[in-house]
């Protein structure tokens, strides 16, 4: 080993403890906000948030004490450890208000619901959402907004005070294959992205209130939409309002949240043309448009919807599937069966890199498709030099290899999860759809766990397996 190389290969435990400790204090501040919401509505659930704050700050304080003397450095390995343990700890403490209050009396169900929130999956075990207090409903939606914030939350809330570790944790949370050299420093970029995230949330809140939602419902649904999570304050989800205006607003903001946020930054810099020149953006919009058009025709000619309703329902469901959001306005189990395959394709594809959406990401699909195309060309022209290009940039062989490895890993997770769920008694279709939904952080599945049903009927073992897949999703997709 060269000098220091052995030490550099080790995990910086004290630095990890410090970051996790600070993040737990930030989560406590979020709990305090939810307690204030409960007090505003005259509800007693505020006390359960206070109990959780005490436990949270106690553990956070212990972690900070254990971090004394930490070296001011973070490696990529440290970054992945922080991201993974943050999801787990936030979920572990985030479930406590649900459990303490009796709103979700089962540890398994409370953990599942909270993990689904922080990973922006949107699958729920609740059969009577409206029975929860306003404070718990607000916390439920806030978990998604925090989870959707992802990279921006970690970067601007914690890392600037730790100096050189920013890049490493950024790369553990960020998703992309290239870095534009025209972009500013990562911490500056993160602040701009946070502003964009907040602006989208506020803009949608205003529009939903114009459409007839209360302020509370509008805020909660805006949290879920911009995070592409899908938690609603109503059991019937967005269909509760039966409002075309609200459906169009949410559909549009789901699509906006599925676009690479750095492209919005370029637009703010006066480089709006970059948006329409971006290969991934065009791929994403073409996919949304084609799927919406095909499903619209299917609903008109096979389900006898009128044209406007067919287009609206198709657009909404394609948007929610393609951006891994969990909202629903229709039971697509009643649609033509071939449309299920189209929606599953949208679930697998996900949104753009650098967005709040889950799924495989369109960038990876583009690289895979273009590499396959080149391989077929090489069969005819063995000596041809055929680089894979994205946005006119040549993608390195190492990135292509990592994309291929990712797909193998992804398929392995689907197969393993599918087999395990069937072992515990879940049906073939339901097992496949819930595994794909959890791994892609999508939300509703098919069959008995479609948009019209909760996931409460799943065996406890299946819920723990799916919770683990939800956690793998945001970590592996990076």
Describe these PLM feature segments.
Residues 1-477:
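Membrane-proximal intracellular helices of multi-pass ion channels
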């Amino acid at each position: 080993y060269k000098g220091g190389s052995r030490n550099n290969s080790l995990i910086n435990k004290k630095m990890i403890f410090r970051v996790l400790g600070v993040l737990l204090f930030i989560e406590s501040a979020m709990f305090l906000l939810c307690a204030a919401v409960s007090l505003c509505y005259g509800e007693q659930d505020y006390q359960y948030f206070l109990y959780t704050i005490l436990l949270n700050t106690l553990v956070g304080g212990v972690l900070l004490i254990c971090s004394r003397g930490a070296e001011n450095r973070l490696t990529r390995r440290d970054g992945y450890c922080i991201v993974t343990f943050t999801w787990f700890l936030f979920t572990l403490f985030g479930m406590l208000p649900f459990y303490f209050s009796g709103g979700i009396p089962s540890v398994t169900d409370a953990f599942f619901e909270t993990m689904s929130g922080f990973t922006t999956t949107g699958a729920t075990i609740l059969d009577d959402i409206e029975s929860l207090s306003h404070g718990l409903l607000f916390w439920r939606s806030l978990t998604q907004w925090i989870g959707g914030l992802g990279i921006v939350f970690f970067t601007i809330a914690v890392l600037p005070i730790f100096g050189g570790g920013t890049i490493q944790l950024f790369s553990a949370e960020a998703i992309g294959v290239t870095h534009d050299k025209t972009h500013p420093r990562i911490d500056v970029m993160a602040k701009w992205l946070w502003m964009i995230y907040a602006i989208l949330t506020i803009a949608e809140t205003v529009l939903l209130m114009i459409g007839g939602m209360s302020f509370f419902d509008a805020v909660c649904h805006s949290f879920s939409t911009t995070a592409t999570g899908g938690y609603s304050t109503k059991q019937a989800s967005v269909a509760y309002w039966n409002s075309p205006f609200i459906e169009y607003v949410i559909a549009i903001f789901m699509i906006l949240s599925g676009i690479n946020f750095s492209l919005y930054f370029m637009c703010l810099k006066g480089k709006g043309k970059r948006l329409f020149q971006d290969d991934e953006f065009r791929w994403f919009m073409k996919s949304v448009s084609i799927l919406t058009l095909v499903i619209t025709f299917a609903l008109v000619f096979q389900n006898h919807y009128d044209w406007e309703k067919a287009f609206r329902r198709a657009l909404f469901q394609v948007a929610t599937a393609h951006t891994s959001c969990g909202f629903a306005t229709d039971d697509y189990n009643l649609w033509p069966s071939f449309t299920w395959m189209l929606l599953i394709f949208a679930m697998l594809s996900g949104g753009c890199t650098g967005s709040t959406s889950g799924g495989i990401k369109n960038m990876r699909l583009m690289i895979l498709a273009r590499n396959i195309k080149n391989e077929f060309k090489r069969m005819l022209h063995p000596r041809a030099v055929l680089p894979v290009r994205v946005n006119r940039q040549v993608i390195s062989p190492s990135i292509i290899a990592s994309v291929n490895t990712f797909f193998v890993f992804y398929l392995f997770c689907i197969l393993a999860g599918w087999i395990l769920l069937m072992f515990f008694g879940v049906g073939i279709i339901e097992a496949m759809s819930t595994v794909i939904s959890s791994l892609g952080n999508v939300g509703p599945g098919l069959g008995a766990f479609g948009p019209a049903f909760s996931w409460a009927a799943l065996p406890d073992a299946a819920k723990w397996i799916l919770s683990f897949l939800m956690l793998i999703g945001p970590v592996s997709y990076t």
